[in-house]
């Protein structure tokens, strides 16, 4: 028997300590049961009057029902990418290292702590919903937030959603959309010494490659924020042997687009710009795609957070995050958490502990009278 079993999660204590406890519970995607159990137990053991706690698969949800004028959702995923010899966690010189420290157990810890400390406070300004969900780091059809949307949509009702992805304590508003298109060229195989008997599939892609290389990406201003689009070839493959004209070539295009376009508009833009339709021997197909999320900074419920963070610390989110799911449901959504996202998924994943404290203080200021 292990005589050094750690106590359950202390949601009311220091969010830095809570972050480290969460990090030290391994939870790669698909293996979230233990961390979901501990989060659920911690919430139920608080016995907060008037607070509803609900378990759905490995998603843990909680909400207040105080009849306040507006509702803010605090959402964070509980899974991580596969562990890369970076557990257990450690803290050195004010930096916490370990799998999930930045993506996104620091943000999750802050949201759990904030919910636990304010749910029954007389100073609370907005009703709160807490969503701790599974399988964000893997295929879309496994995403816990999507399952909640499909099976229990009433739990996602809110005037504003905050997602605890790492932002360095800044507000990263909305997110860009993400589109991947596979373009395939068909030719005729032949010996390279008699190339005129064949039809080089790779050469058929070359005009499209040239158009992508010459593409001038747009910079789009929305609510005073600049979103930067990008169209790139991210994978290309062809070839049979060094003396064979290839009869097949394909490439993947990735288009990151500003949230003023929806997914269908993004597809249409790429197809028209690259003239993919009507080319002999060329076919294309959408491999994956998701629309972005508008920033929603003009909402009244958002103004207090902007004041607490500071207007000089607001920027556009260039990557795609689950705020897109909230936007699709008509809920304004912002990314707000601790840490530098460039350390996500790395062996040296890390988060400054000071930022955990700062983000918790900002959230308390925003949500309290």
UniProtKB/Swiss-Prot annotation:
Keywords: Amino-acid biosynthesis, Cobalt, Diaminopimelate biosynthesis, Hydrolase, Lysine biosynthesis, Metal-binding, Zinc. Binds 2 Zn(2+) or Co(2+) ions per subunit. It comes from the Bacteria. Its cofactor is Zn(2+); Co(2+). Its EC number is 3.5.1.18. GO terms for molecular function: acetylornithine deacetylase activity; metal ion binding; succinyl-diaminopimelate desuccinylase activity. It catalyses: N-succinyl-(2S,6S)-2,6-diaminopimelate + H2O = (2S,6S)-2,6-diaminopimelate + succinate. Zn(2+) 2 binds at residues 103, 137, 345. Zn(2+) 1 binds at residues 77, 103, 165. The active site is at residues 79, 136. Pathway: Amino-acid biosynthesis; L-lysine biosynthesis via DAP pathway; LL-2,6-diaminopimelate from (S)-tetrahydrodipicolinate (succinylase route): step 3/3. GO terms for biological process: diaminopimelate biosynthetic process; L-arginine biosynthetic process; lysine biosynthetic process via diaminopimelate. InterPro entries: ArgE/DapE_CS (IPR001261), Bact_exopeptidase_dim_dom (IPR036264), Peptidase_M20 (IPR002933), Peptidase_M20_dimer (IPR011650), Peptidase_M20A (IPR050072), Succinyl-DAP_deSuclase_DapE (IPR010174). Gene3D superfamilies: 3.30.70.360, Zn peptidases (3.40.630.10). Belongs to the peptidase M20A family. This is Succinyl-diaminopimelate desuccinylase. It comes from Corynebacterium glutamicum (strain ATCC 13032 / DSM 20300 / JCM 1318 / BCRC 11384 / CCUG 27702 / LMG 3730 / NBRC 12168 / NCIMB 10025 / NRRL B-2784 / 534).
């Amino acid at each position: 028997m292990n005589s050094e079993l750690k106590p359950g999660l202390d949601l009311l204590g220091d969010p830095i300590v809570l972050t480290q406890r969460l990090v030290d519970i391994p939870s790669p995607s698909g293996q979230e049961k233990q961390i979901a159990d501990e989060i659920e137990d911690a919430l139920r053991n608080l016995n907060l009057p008037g607070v509803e706690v609900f378990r759905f698969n490995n998603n843990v949800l909680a909400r207040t029902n105080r009849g306040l004028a507006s509702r803010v959702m605090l959402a964070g995923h509980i899974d991580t990418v596969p562990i890369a010899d970076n557990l257990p966690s450690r803290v050195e010189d004010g930096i916490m290292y370990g799998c999930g420290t930045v993506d996104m157990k620091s943000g999750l810890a802050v949201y759990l702590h904030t919910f636990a400390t304010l749910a029954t406070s007389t100073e609370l300004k907005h009703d709160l919903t807490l969503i701790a969900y599974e399988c964000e780091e893997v295929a879309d059809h496994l995403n816990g937030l999507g399952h909640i949307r499909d099976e229990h949509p009433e739990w996602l009702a809110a005037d504003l959603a905050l997602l605890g992805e790492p932002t360095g304590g800044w507000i990263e508003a909305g997110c860009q959309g993400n589109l991947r298109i596979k373009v395939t060229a068909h030719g005729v195989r032949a010996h390279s010494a008699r190339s005129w008997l064949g039809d080089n599939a790779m050469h058929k892609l070359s005009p499209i490659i040239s158009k992508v290389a010459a593409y001038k990406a747009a910079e789009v201003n929305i609510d005073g924020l600049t979103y930067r689009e990008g169209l790139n070839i991210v994978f290309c493959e062809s070839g049979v042997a060094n003396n064979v004209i290839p009869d097949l070539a394909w490439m993947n295009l990735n288009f990151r687009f500003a949230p003023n376009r929806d997914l269908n508009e993004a597809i249409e833009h790429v197809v028209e710009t690259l003239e993919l339709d009507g080319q002999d021997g060329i076919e294309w197909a959408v491999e994956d795609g998701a629309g972005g999320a508008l920033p929603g900074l003009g909402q009244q419920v958002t103004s207090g957070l902007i004041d607490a963070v500071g207007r000089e610390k607001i920027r556009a989110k260039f990557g795609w995050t689950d705020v897109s799911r909230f936007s699709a449901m008509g809920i304004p959504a912002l990314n707000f958490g601790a840490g530098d996202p460039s350390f996500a998924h790395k062996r040296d994943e890390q988060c400054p502990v000071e930022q955990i404290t700062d983000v918790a203080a900002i959230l308390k200021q925003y949500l309290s009278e």
